[in-house]
Design a protein with these regions (language model features):
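Membrane-interface micro-motifs in multi-pass membrane enzymes
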Residues: 127-149, 163
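C-terminal transmembrane module of polytopic alpha-helical membrane proteins
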Residues: 1-16, 26, 174-228
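C-terminal ends of transmembrane helices
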Residues: 4-8, 90-98, 149-156
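N-terminal TM1-TM2 helical hairpin plus the immediately adjacent luminal interfacial "cap"
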Residues: 14-130, 178-188, 201
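Hydrophobic membrane-spanning alpha-helices of multi-pass integral membrane proteins
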Residues: 163-178
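Alpha-helical transmembrane bundle and helix-membrane interface signal
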Residues: 99, 147-160, 205-210
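Cytoplasmic-side transmembrane-helix entry/capping segments in multi-pass membrane proteins
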Residues: 104-112, 132-137, 157-167
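Membrane-embedded alpha-helical segments of multi-pass membrane proteins
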Residues: 84, 133-141, 187-194
Length: 228
């Protein structure tokens, strides 16, 4: 007799990768905002907040003193509109990948893009810190363009909008904003997009470099998920 599997997914839904990505970015922004408010209420200078809390989470030329910034920089934001823009684009293109069954690849693409972007940023070097989800979001966009360029969103609206059109809009906007950025940030963003492209190309050849992450999540789900 078969036993029913009463385990629930860790975040409560099978297609939770996008929810998880959004949650980490949004919760991180709220937590940093609350800490900033505490500094303000305690009449502490915001420069102190930046030096003690925010800057150690961003990637800078002094990354060796805060090596964790290699993993945290692409999860932190300091502006509501920048955060909103990144999360909207992340949602649009992650959703298209989810529709094509690539949900489990969202986090690996986000992760590898962040690492490759960080390495390239360190190699080029810059006096300005790197932070925000832009590098990883670019990877998700490029991955969507490489995998499903003709997939249509809002199909009930005049036949739908092809992914490639939205991708071109994103890349044009990204290119415009990068005009004011330093070379290290430009290269990091390009490398992030390259990570998304290479990941998809390898996936098409049957090479899943996110497999170890899938296995880790499965292990965590079995260990921590609530059971009925």
């Amino acid at each position: 007799m078969q036993t029913e599997n009463n385990e629930k997914p860790l975040l409560g839904a099978d297609n939770n990768a996008l929810v998880a990505l959004l949650a980490v970015n949004l919760v991180g922004y709220v937590i940093l905002g609350l800490i900033k408010v505490v500094y303000y209420l305690e009449s502490l200078p915001l420069e102190q907040y930046a030096a003690q809390i925010f800057q150690p989470l961003t990637l800078s030329s002094k990354w060796i003193s805060s090596p964790w910034s290699l993993l945290t920089y692409n999860w932190v934001h300091d502006g509501f509109w920048i955060l909103s823009g990144n999360m909207i684009w992340l949602s649009i293109f992650s959703y298209t990948l989810q529709e094509k069954g690539a949900n489990k690849h969202l986090f690996p693409i986000y992760f590898y893009a962040g690492i490759l972007g960080a390495i390239s940023y360190i190699i080029i070097g810059s006096n300005q810190p790197l932070f925000g989800a832009g590098v990883s979001v670019t990877a998700i966009v490029v991955a969507s363009l490489a995998l499903i360029p003709n997939h249509k969103l809002l199909s009930n609206l005049a036949g739908g909008i092809p992914v490639w059109i939205l991708g071109v809009v994103f890349l044009l906007l990204q290119g415009y904003f990068l005009l004011d950025a330093n070379m290290a940030t430009d290269i990091a963003t390009i490398c992030g997009g390259l990570a998304g492209f290479v990941y998809v190309m390898l996936l098409k050849k049957g090479k899943d470099f996110g497999k170890w992450m899938h296995q880790l999540l499965h292990l965590l789900n079995n260990s921590l998920a609530p059971k009925n």
